[in-house]
Swiss-Prot record:
It is an enzyme of class 3 (hydrolase). Its EC number is 3.2.1.14. InterPro entries: Chitin-bd_1 (IPR001002), Endochitinase-like_sf (IPR036861). GO terms for molecular function: chitin binding; endochitinase activity. This is Endochitinase B. It comes from Pisum sativum. The keyword Thylakoid does not apply.
Length: 23
């Protein structure tokens, strides 16, 4: 997945689900 736990719970400014890279 590109979001959630693998992304460290990161989210984009658009309130979208982002990857661990921040996009």
């Amino acid at each position: 997945e590109q979001c959630g736990r693998q992304a460290g719970g990161a989210t984009c400014p658009n309130n979208l689900c982002c990857s661990q890279y921040g996009y």
